[in-house]
């Protein structure tokens, strides 16, 4: 017999989730969460020498993954009305009517609670509360307020999405250290050029729903300049793990190569853009971050510090 929660006009049930599992899966932004969990895994790996204890590794990844999924679902709930209008998002599960807002709220709350309990009980309270702070920062401070209030929304709000390496680090060590914050700084610096490239591509959608993204408020040319400058800043920030002795030559070569390519995309976007250049830059930025952190991982295990 399915477990059912009565929520007024709607019924939230386990059978409802199984019937619409794809829609619930989609509102958790699984590809984004996978990248966040990868960066958390790198934070864990760099925090301790040798193999990671699976008794800590599995609950940490599960808890961080569940709370990140809940944050993504809350983002869908808050943006449901503007998603209905925007071309990129009108087919998402909530505006398309595949899931009710009430059911989405119950689902998001349930997986957030489960994730928090796993982290608190099986990892440590510090990681549980930091992960919860990330959820609040992204879902409420960024999505509810900053996104609608300032063109610097993603610069400030990006901090919430940048903390998974710190969460991974604290999961293993139960302390906040400068090297963990350095990994956060990389993602924090990467976020604006990543997101603004998409915002250029979707400028008209954002203008239609009065979201003050940088291309809407300051124009596309200004935004392209900012993207180019941020890729230069990102290049410098990505050198820091090598310069402070966190990583070796393998990471240095990988970081320089990836950042040169990212800079090349940003240069083309600014000075020789074609119709698809903004979207191509956005897509490469995701590959950039994923490969950068995979190379950090390979560098750590293949070339252990002497």
UniProtKB/Swiss-Prot annotation:
Subcellular compartments: Cell inner membrane
Pathway listed: Porphyrin-containing compound metabolism; heme O biosynthesis; heme O from protoheme: step 1/1
GO BP annotations listed: heme O biosynthetic process
Alphabetic keyword roster: Cell inner membrane, Cell membrane, Heme biosynthesis, Membrane, Transferase, Transmembrane, Transmembrane helix
Pfam family, one: UbiA
Keyword Repressor attached: no
Catalytic reaction equation(s): heme b + (2E,6E)-farnesyl diphosphate + H2O = Fe(II)-heme o + diphosphate
Enzyme class: transferase
Top-level taxon in the UniProt lineage: Bacteria
Mode of membrane association: Multi-pass membrane protein
PROSITE patterns reported for this sequence: UBIA
InterPro entries linked to this entry: Protohaem_IX_farnesylTrfase, UbiA_prenyltransferase, UbiA_prenylTrfase_CS, UbiA_sf
GO molecular function, one term: protoheme IX farnesyltransferase activity
Family annotation (PANTHER family): 4-HYDROXYBENZOATE SOLANESYLTRANSFERASE, PROTOHEME IX FARNESYLTRANSFERASE, MITOCHONDRIAL
Described purpose of this protein according to its UniProt entry: Converts heme B (protoheme IX) to heme O by substitution of the vinyl group on carbon 2 of heme B porphyrin ring with a hydroxyethyl farnesyl side group.
Protein name per UniProt: Protoheme IX farnesyltransferase
């Amino acid at each position: 017999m399915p477990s059912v929660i009565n929520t007024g006009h709607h019924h939230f049930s386990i059978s409802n989730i199984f019937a619409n599992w794809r829609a619930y899966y989609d509102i958790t932004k699984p590809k984004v969460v996978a990248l966040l969990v990868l960066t958390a895994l790198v934070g864990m790996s760099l925090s301790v020498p040798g193999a990671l204890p699976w008794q800590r590794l599995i609950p940490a990844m599960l808890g961080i993954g569940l709370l990140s999924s809940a944050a993504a679902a809350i983002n869908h709930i808050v943006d449901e009305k503007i998603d209905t209008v925007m071309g990129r998002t009108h087919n998402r599960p909530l505006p398309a009517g595949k899931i009710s807002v009430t059911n989405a709220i119950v689902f998001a709350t349930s997986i957030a609670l489960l994730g928090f309990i796993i982290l608190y009980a099986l990892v440590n309270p510090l990681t549980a509360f930091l992960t919860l702070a990330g959820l609040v920062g992204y879902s409420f401070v960024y999505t509810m307020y900053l996104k609608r209030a300032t063109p610097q929304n993603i610069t400030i709000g990006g901090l919430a999405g940048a903390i998974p390496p710190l969460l991974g680090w604290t999961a293993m060590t139960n302390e906040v250290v400068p090297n963990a914050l350095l990994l956060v700084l990389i993602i924090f610096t990467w976020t604006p050029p990543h997101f603004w490239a998409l915002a250029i591509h979707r400028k008209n959608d954002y203008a239609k729903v009065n979201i003050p993204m940088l291309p809407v408020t300051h124009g596309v040319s200004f935004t392209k300049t900012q993207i180019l400058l941020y890729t230069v800043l990102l290049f410098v920030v990505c050198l820091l793990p090598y310069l402070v002795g966190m990583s070796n030559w393998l990471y240095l070569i990988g970081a320089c190569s990836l950042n040169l390519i990212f800079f090349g995309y940003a240069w083309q976007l600014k000075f020789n853009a074609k119709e698809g250049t903004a979207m191509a830059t956005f897509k490469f930025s995701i590959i950039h971050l994923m490969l950068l952190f995979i190379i950090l991982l390979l560098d750590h295990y293949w070339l252990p510090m002497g």
